[in-house]
């Protein structure tokens, strides 16, 4: 049956207020809670529920004064039942989000066109009021890491599901392409490590010899001992065909051919290395009857942090919809659940304990493309987050821009409160502006990215979820950010 609240939503209501008189019996509160959240999710609305309190007649029934505020299936606030003093339950409902979610739901649009009875309702239009100014705080709290669940158990479940989706996608593509080998470049960083783990899991799933995973390390001008040793360790312990192809001489020959001074460490200096590595991987794939498995992640795709037709290109990109802040959790899940603990797979690698230590060291290594020479102590000089900003900020911006459709002013307001005590407001504003600048400017790379599995609600595939012109103009977004006062 269509509930009264559903009818109201079909006729334009965004927030339903239900003053109820629901008595209490054992287990009824759980059912009521589920019902409220289900109604708010199904009707894409805010739902405010309140019930009669303990001072109602108790002749046969007892009332608890249960109050619930829900938004699109998510609990915003809830009181303690059976309170004997008057209380107020309050919370922030995101009206803009409700409007955005409804704009994406075609079935709701169809139902609205069929089942509206506008003549049965009285419409009272209220001019929107500015309830909060920039100096006031939200009651509601937003997770600083929206791609990662708050509790450990859910994190483990989510990581396992992501890993299985990646594995299933790669398995199907290997079979469809009749590929004999999977070729993957290993840098000793997080993304290539996850890609190699996905390859290893896929070959176990298909019953194939892991020696048909051709793992290639290609030391260059910025490679450090730490990443080099970790790369060799994980490749060897996973049983892959380990190959080492130094790129220094080839890149120097290329510099000479195009007349580039190798002492000038500019974008040409960096991108020549990335494209040389991609060429090596592609040629090995041709030679062995396989294809190249891409390693880039969702955050890099959003920021365009890749070399066009370099690491930007592969035959199948297994990490393409996994954000950077989540990559380390998936790698950590493999380390702690496949290589140790009660669910350890004893024959997962040649030495589970050593592989696990290497994975944890990779998780602790600064994020870097290692295209610039290390310092005199052999440490990484080129750190990605110093160049483009913290990934925890960019993933926050990405999630709420794509998934919630937040405009710049609103996103800045929420981000500054969410990261209060971690980053200064001016710092958040600086990197939000950079996020918009890069996101728009780098769409041309996303317009031609390889296939890869969607693992979550936020993805940037140009073939499905994100169709954006390569020359879209960012001026309005940047202007709104620039006009925001701190």
Language-model features and meaning:
Residues 2-89:
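CN hydrolase (nitrilase-like) catalytic-core segments centered on the catalytic cysteine
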Residues 43-45, 54-57, 71, 78-79, ...:
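ATP/NTP-dependent adenylation/nucleotidyl-transfer catalytic domains that generate, transfer
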């Amino acid at each position: 049956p269509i509930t009264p609240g559903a009818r109201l939503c079909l006729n334009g209501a965004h927030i339903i207020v239900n003053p109820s008189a629901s008595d209490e019996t054992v287990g009824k509160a759980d059912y009521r809670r589920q019902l409220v959240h289900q109604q708010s999710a199904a009707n894409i609305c805010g739902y405010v529920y309140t019930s009669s309190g303990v001072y109602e007649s108790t002749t046969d029934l007892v009332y608890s004064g249960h109050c619930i505020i829900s938004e699109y299936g998510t609990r915003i606030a809830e009181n303690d039942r059976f309170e004997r003093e008057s209380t107020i339950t309050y919370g922030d409902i995101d009206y803009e989000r409700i409007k955005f979610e409804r704009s994406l739901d075609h079935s709701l649009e169809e139902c609205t066109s069929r089942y509206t009875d506008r003549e049965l309702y009285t419409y009272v239009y209220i001019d929107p009021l500015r309830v909060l100014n920039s100096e006031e705080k939200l009651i509601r709290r937003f997770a600083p890491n929206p791609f990662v669940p708050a509790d450990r158990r859910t994190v483990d479940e989510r990581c396992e599901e992501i890993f299985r989706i990646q594995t299933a996608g790669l398995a199907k593509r290997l079979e469809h392409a009749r590929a004999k080998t999977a070729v993957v470049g290993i840098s000793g960083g997080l993304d290539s490590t996850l890609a190699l783990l996905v390859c290893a899991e896929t070959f176990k799933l298909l019953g194939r010899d892991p020696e048909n995973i051709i793992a290639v390390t290609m030391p260059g001008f910025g490679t450090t001992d730490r990443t080099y040793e970790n790369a060799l360790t994980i490749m060897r312990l996973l049983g892959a065909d380990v190959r080492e192809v130094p790129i220094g001489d080839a890149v120097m020959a290329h510099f000479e051919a195009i007349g580039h001074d190798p002492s000038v460490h500019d974008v040409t200096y960096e991108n020549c290395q990335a494209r040389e590595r991609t060429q090596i991987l592609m040629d090995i794939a041709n030679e062995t009857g396989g294809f190249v498995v891409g390693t880039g992640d969702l955050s890099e795709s959003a920021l365009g942090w890749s070399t066009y037709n370099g690491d930007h290109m592969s035959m199948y990109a297994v990490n393409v919809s996994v954000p950077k802040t989540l990559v380390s959790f998936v790698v950590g899940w493999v380390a702690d659940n496949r290589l140790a603990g009660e669910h350890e797979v004893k024959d997962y690698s040649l030495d589970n304990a050593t592989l696990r230590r290497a994975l944890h060291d990779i998780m602790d290594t600064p994020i870097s493309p290692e295209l610039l020479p290390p310092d005199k102590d052999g440490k990484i000089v080129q750190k990605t987050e110093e160049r483009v900003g913290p990934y925890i900020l960019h993933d926050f911006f990405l999630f709420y821009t794509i998934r919630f459709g937040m405009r710049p002013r609103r996103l800045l307001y929420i981000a500054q409160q969410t990261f209060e005590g971690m980053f200064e407001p001016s710092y958040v504003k600086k990197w939000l502006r950079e996020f918009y600048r890069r996101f728009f400017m780098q769409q041309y790379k996303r317009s031609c990215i390889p296939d890869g599995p969607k693992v979550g609600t936020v993805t940037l595939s140009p073939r499905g979820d994100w169709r954006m012109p390569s020359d879209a103009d960012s001026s309005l977004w940047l202007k709104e950010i620039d006009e925001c006062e701190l």
